[in-house]
């Protein structure tokens, strides 16, 4: 299936903020590290028929480059260094790093190359896949239907929060990867800008064009890669946390907790890290149980939870966000990142549950052992066993 009308992507910045944040850290600290990443569809969708169309879009991405106005805008942000931005100015996507195949209806994608380059593929490639699939499956759906659905949800949201103090409710758009389309995401974000509790977007292109705050720190791959970068597997998570502070000592201080489960994370998150990091991000498992563990951990360390921020971003919608806000608002600072339930929430449209995750670093396996068993990713069962042993986790979950 080919012949999509035009390139889906129009800007190098049409990606999530944490990709550039991580890329700068990789550029400075791990310039020569090599990685491999793979696509997964967690649902039962047979997406292989779109392989040719996806390959066309991958080829088109080599023409994207950082424009001068984009360069100047990034230069005005407090956390980017001139050497990285000058390098990014010359960056081009290399389609040779991407292998796209149709395996009897199953879509297979494997990315290989220097981490500093491969790191850029995940978010825009997922956005491309999502937009292509929805273009063919739902050709008559689009911005109008998405905005109608959002308005209906906002009416319910207003009723739900009528008697709540919403002054500490902060919502972010995290919807780039699985959006219905670029146009839908932009329309949704522009509508949400009218709400006092909407504080920003993870999409750098939208943040620049709509004068919003870009949101994001690091992703699972930062911790996964350190499983092979660090000489000692048992201390790899601490090495990742320390390396992040080395690059960003006073900003971008929200740590992701579920690469090797929340319990293993908290064992590594001692007083020095807990004091210096601004807060934590939830991305799998029971959010209430996770939040209670986080608050208890801060209290045990003698840190006032009200000086820290918990970011919830796992499969949220507005109603779930309000429920979590009711539960935690008086005890800790809160932010909520909603993705698919904002940017691909259209009647009769089935969002894709798709990811691209790191599977190798320097030719050796890495793994994600999240707080949701179905999100565990690794080819090498022996490495999963070694990782569980190193972090004192029970040998129960299977890698997928």
Curated annotation (Swiss-Prot):
Give one GO molecular function term.
Answer: nicotinate phosphoribosyltransferase activity
Instruction: Look up keyword Ribosomal protein and say if it applies.
Output: no
**A GO cellular-component term linked to this record:** cytosol
Which keywords does this chain's UniProt record carry?
A: Ligase, Phosphoprotein, Pyridine nucleotide biosynthesis
Give all Phosphohistidine modified positions.
Answer: 220
User: What role does this protein play?
Assistant: Catalyzes the synthesis of beta-nicotinate D-ribonucleotide from nicotinate and 5-phospho-D-ribose 1-phosphate at the expense of ATP.
HAMAP family in the record, alphabetically? NAPRTase
- This one is known as Nicotinate phosphoribosyltransferase
Tell me which species this is from. Answer: Salmonella paratyphi B (strain ATCC BAA-1250 / SPB7)
Upper taxonomic lineage: Bacteria, Pseudomonadati, Pseudomonadota, Gammaproteobacteria, Enterobacterales
């Amino acid at each position: 299936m080919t012949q999509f009308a035009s390139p889906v992507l129009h800007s190098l910045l049409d990606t999530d903020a944490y990709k550039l944040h991580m890329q700068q850290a990789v550029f400075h600290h791990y310039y020569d590290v090599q990685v491999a990443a793979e696509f997964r569809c967690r649902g039962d969708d047979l997406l292989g028929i779109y392989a040719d169309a996806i390959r066309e879009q991958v080829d088109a991405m080599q023409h994207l480059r950082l424009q001068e106005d984009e360069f100047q805008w990034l230069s005005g942000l407090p956390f980017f260094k001139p050497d990285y931005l000058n390098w990014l100015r010359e960056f081009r996507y290399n389609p040779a790093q991407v292998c796209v195949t149709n395996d009897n209806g199953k879509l297979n994608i494997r990315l290989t190359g220097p981490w500093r380059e491969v790191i850029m593929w995940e978010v825009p490639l997922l956005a491309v896949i999502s937009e292509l699939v929805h273009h063919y499956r739902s050709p008559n759906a689009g911005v109008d239907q998405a905005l109608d659905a959002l308005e209906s949800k906002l009416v319910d949201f207003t009723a739900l929060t009528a008697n709540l103090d919403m002054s500490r409710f902060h919502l972010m758009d995290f919807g780039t990867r699985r959006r219905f389309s670029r146009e839908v995401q932009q329309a949704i974000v522009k509508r949400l800008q009218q709400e006092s509790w909407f504080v920003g977007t993870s999409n750098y292109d939208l943040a620049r064009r709509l004068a919003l705050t870009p949101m994001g720190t690091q992703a699972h791959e930062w911790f996964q890669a350190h499983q092979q970068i660090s000489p000692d597997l048992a201390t790899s998570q601490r090495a990742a946390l320390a390396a992040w502070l080395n690059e960003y000592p006073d900003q971008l201080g929200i740590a992701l907790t579920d690469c090797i489960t929340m319990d293993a994370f908290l064992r590594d998150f001692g007083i020095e890290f807990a004091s210096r990091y601004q807060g934590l991000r939830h991305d799998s498992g029971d959010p209430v149980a996770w939040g209670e563990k986080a608050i208890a951990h801060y209290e045990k360390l003698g840190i006032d939870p009200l000086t820290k921020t918990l970011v919830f971003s796992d499969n949220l919608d507005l109603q779930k966000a309000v429920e979590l806000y009711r539960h935690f608002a008086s005890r800790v600072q809160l932010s909520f990142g909603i993705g698919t339930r904002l940017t691909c929430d259209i009647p009769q449209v089935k969002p894709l549950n798709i990811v691209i995750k790191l599977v190798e670093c320097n030719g050796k396996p890495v793994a994600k052992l999240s707080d949701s068993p179905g999100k565990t990713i690794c080819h090498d069962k022996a490495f999963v066993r070694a990782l569980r042993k190193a972090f004192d986790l029970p040998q129960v979950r299977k890698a997928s």
